[in-house]
Amino acid sequence: MANEKAFNLQSAYSDLNKACSAQAYDKIINISGKILTKFPGETKAFQCKVVALIRAEKYEDCLSFLKKNPTLSSHVIFEKAYVEYRLNRLTEAAKTLESEEASDSKVQELKAQVLYRKGDFAGAYAYLRTVIRNSQDDYSEERLANLTAVAAAESCFNNANLDLDVNPQMYEGKFNLACYHLGRGDCYLASRSLDDAENTCNLCLSEDPELTEEERNEELAPIRVQRAYILQLNKEEEEANQVYQSVIRQRASDPALLAVAANNIVCINQDQNIFDSRKRIKMASTDGLQFKLFSRQRTDMLINQALFYWYTNQMEACTAKLRTVSQEELSPRALLLSATQLIKEKNVDKAVLLLQSYLSNFAGSQIDAEIPLALAQLNLRRTSANNLGTGSPQPKNALNVAQMLENILPQHLIHSPGVLSTRIALYLLASSGENAVQTRPDSMKQIVNCIESTLHYYEELGEQNEIYSHLLDNCAAFLLQQGEAKLAAELLEKQLARLESNICQEKQNSLIKQVLVARLVRAYAQFDRPKAEQTCKSLQAKESLSEADVDTLETTFLYGAKSLKRLGKPSEPTDTSDKGKSKRSQIKKSISDIPSSEDPGAQPVISRPKRKKRKVRLPKNYQPGVMPDPNRWLPRRERTHYRGKRRDKRFAPTRGPQGQITGESEWDAAIRSPKVKIPEDGSAGSTPKQMSNTAKQQQKKGRKKGR
């Protein structure tokens, strides 16, 4: 029996070896299954069947087979994790890989793939770096393409920059490099990388003569879509829309690419071209896309669709899309859109409660700035229940919002320059107007505390921070304007100390230093007069602003060259070459032609004799103790008693109704005129005789002559 057993097993393995050499995966599955039926503990047969199921892409059958044999599954941990990865069970795949030895390069590479699909791009980047450093095979270019894809995803979705010093040769790697530059906001480098990727792709495709035009377009479709996205970023939406439409008409085999193009078309259309947008939304909502897109991409697509429904007043569809987003992840954009929808329905209280519930679930640095700022805006504008005011906010609301921001915002947001200026404005608003809830000194105390805490926060981070220098300047100017001279002087002293410590840029800081010293003198003058006088000595005073003759320039501006000649006053000779130029340019040239005192070869300026002071001539009716008429210095037409030049209107014909005179009966000529006899009844109805034709002609001729 033992010899028969050995013989049967040996022949079975021989058949299995032949099937493996021929890559007949169905035959491998049958033979290894027969071996495991008779000999359940055969590890080699078990491994062969698992690999054959993977090669045949029967991942569900493979995973169920592994679960039925938990004892032998410990020998194929990597294969089990790969099957779970292909079935999009990423969490289970990550747990399976934790029990595998981490030093194995293939395990590290699979871990990088799993982390990349889960959205942990930094972890995937670290694993891929290790694999590339330790591997020496023919797949280095593929790994470089994967590395650039990871760096591009990190820059696009997380706004983080990973060091990428690679020069991929494959067009896939060049395409990923273009996406990396796009994530960093550099459209120029992205366009250049896309050009390189397209040229490399065309060169590779030209080597295959059997390639059809459809297959060529399918390979170039991702590059064209990315180029259209750059056009869309540059506000060239019509050109981008044409590219998206052409890619969709070609019907690429990648559903994720079609979904991205359709989503971008919806963004371009907004609330226009509703029929086309509905078709694109349907294309971007096909089944299976959740496994081909990142979670950030899926969320953005759903929010864009909800925005389209919101613009077109389809509130039920908008709510359904937002509900789908909330089931996957809690997105701040989706939450803001839900609050906007409630405000549109005039449910302001529900919108406030929705935002407050989000803030209560998150604390610390996890809070996005959009949610608390939106809540602050609602509380600031809310006048009563479910009503938002449009005028100036109430001081009570301003004080409550300022205190709310201090309680809910994390440190890095509460001390940002924008939030600091907002808090200062709110405290000033709380102490202004008739309904002020606190006095101006109390508000200034709170403002000073805000400024001091913010400056202390940046001092701990490092005084070389640019934001710290910006805050010192602006806070000092504000405090000096509000009368807080002592604190303003302290801030100016700190800024001067920072400038003096920076020796490298001494020439650039000299002018800034003079400005700060001037501000410091203003601050000292309000509480320490001797110190202000001492600080004034460090200011660099100029002896003269210009070498030009100020009196000549003033008279030239006031009277002009012709008036000076007419009055007999001396004027500078004009150059004939400057006839066509303006008077201002001629004056500039005259100033530039004057030699400066610093030039050793310049001729000395001849001093002109001083003019005699004109004797004061007082008017004849001058009275020493009486205030003169203030209108005497105004032009004649601007004086209060000026009525203009009167005209003789006695012979001018009167036009229109001239009013009624009380004594009109005295001047009525009809009263004093004799009475006219009224004709009898028979003659009253008679008509005048008709004129003859000859009389009419004579009358017409007479009119012509009169003309």
Curated annotation (Swiss-Prot):
Biased composition (Polar residues): 684-695
Stretches for region Disordered: 564-707
An individual GO BP term: SRP-dependent cotranslational protein targeting to membrane
Comp. bias (Basic residues): 608-618, 638-649, 698-707
Subcellular location: Cytoplasm; Endoplasmic reticulum
Ranges in a coiled coil: none
Key words, A-Z: Cytoplasm, Endoplasmic reticulum, Ribonucleoprotein, Signal recognition particle
InterPro entries: Signal_recog_part_SRP72_RNA-bd (IPR013699), SRP72 (IPR026270), SRP72_TPR-like (IPR031545), TPR-like_helical_dom_sf (IPR011990), TPR_rpt (IPR019734)
GO MF term set: 7S RNA binding; ribosome binding
Record's subunit section: Component of a signal recognition particle (SRP) complex that consists of a 7SL RNA molecule of 300 nucleotides and six protein subunits: SRP72, SRP68, SRP54, SRP19, SRP14 and SRP9.
Reported function: Component of the signal recognition particle (SRP) complex, a ribonucleoprotein complex that mediates the cotranslational targeting of secretory and membrane proteins to the endoplasmic reticulum (ER). The SRP complex interacts with the signal sequence in nascent secretory and membrane proteins and directs them to the membrane of the ER. The SRP complex targets the ribosome-nascent chain complex to the SRP receptor (SR), which is anchored in the ER, where SR compaction and GTPase rearrangement drive cotranslational protein translocation into the ER.
Name of this protein: Signal recognition particle subunit SRP72
Organism: Schistosoma mansoni
Organism classification: Eukaryota, Metazoa, Spiralia, Lophotrochozoa, Platyhelminthes
